[in-house]
Amino acid sequence: MSVIKMTDLDLAGKRVLIRADLNVPVKDGKVTSDARIRASLPTIETALKQGAKVMVTSHLGRPTEGEYNEEFSLLPVVNYLKDKLSAPVRLAKDYLDGVEIAAGELVVLENVRFNKGEKKDDETLSKKYAALCDVYVMDAFGTAHRAQASTHGVGKFAPIACAGPLLSAELEALGKALGNPARPMVAIVGGSKVSTKLTVLGALSKIADQLIVGGGIANTFVAAQGNNVGKSLYEADLIPEAKRLLETCDIPVPTDVRVATEFSETATATLKPANQIKDDEQILDLGDESAERLAEILKNAKTILWNGPVGVFEFPNFRKGTEIVARAIAESEAFSIAGGGDTLAAIDLFGIADQISYISTGGGAFLEFVEGKKLPAVVMLEERAKQ
């Protein structure tokens, strides 16, 4: 995958437009989780240190396109950046006709979704973004799967279009895990629905030496073995697909599970064999035996790709399976890559972020890359690198 990297360019005196992912949760005008901004800081600081005239922009939330809405303003992000950077930082609301900017200054361009045509990758808007800069830096992996004006169109018209350090690292880590993985490679796909992850399972079944399923996805596999799953979340119409995957891949299906008679935080967990579930029960977690069997598999892995929890870990009584699996990944010597919102929440809960080799910032983009789909932003950067 050959793209121009920001780190290979001399940015001194250049107008640099960075498309970052600053889509953070905001409450009462304050940023409540700064992970995405923190991840973007090194890119911004590198450009500032080189004496570039730096602009950074992002989307935030889902405002009505083309309309200014204070609720979705990047102002809280600007205030956060003022605290963290020694450089002067200001917000520009009207910037499509040009921005006055000094070297070593950071100008945050207001929410791109306030601009009509952003989501449709409008060419006129893309050219306006491109006219603002000498160098366009795509650094938002989380939106790389969307062809929009600020993530894709602008790169076609900017004098130079390159990948920022965050995007480069993401592509490198995914390439390492999927392109030429150290073996054995183990892939864990959890979460609630098989249908949304079927293509992922199919793609991974061709790459991984061992496929592991968890959560609602595993329930469909338990049912595919002819077991009653009671009120469990599962997808009856996908049982034939689960059977096909079981025939072609070695997938360890849970042999024991934790069940409850209601889906609630206070529900009592009952540990039982997976083939003895009653009609009024639902599977909410793996049993100890099943979780330990997965931990054993993970211990011997050389590459681990983790997407999705293996139980309803948000409920304390149904957390154990995900915790056993998470700690096994953390303690493994394998190159481990984790992605997806629920996965990141589990990593935070168990405090193992430092023990995962690479944590992906992209949800949908992460899954599409794993499926083998071409991400529009990456395709654009590759094409620009050839010119």
Curated annotation (Swiss-Prot):
Keywords: ATP-binding, Cytoplasm, Glycolysis, Kinase, Nucleotide-binding, Transferase
Single GO biological process annotation from the record: gluconeogenesis
GO molecular function: ADP binding; ATP binding; phosphoglycerate kinase activity
Binding site for substrate: D21, L22, N23, R36, H59, L60, G61, R62, R113, R146
Main subcellular location: cytoplasm
The protein's Enzyme Commission number: 2.7.2.3
Name listed for the protein in its UniProt record: Phosphoglycerate kinase
Originating gene: pgk
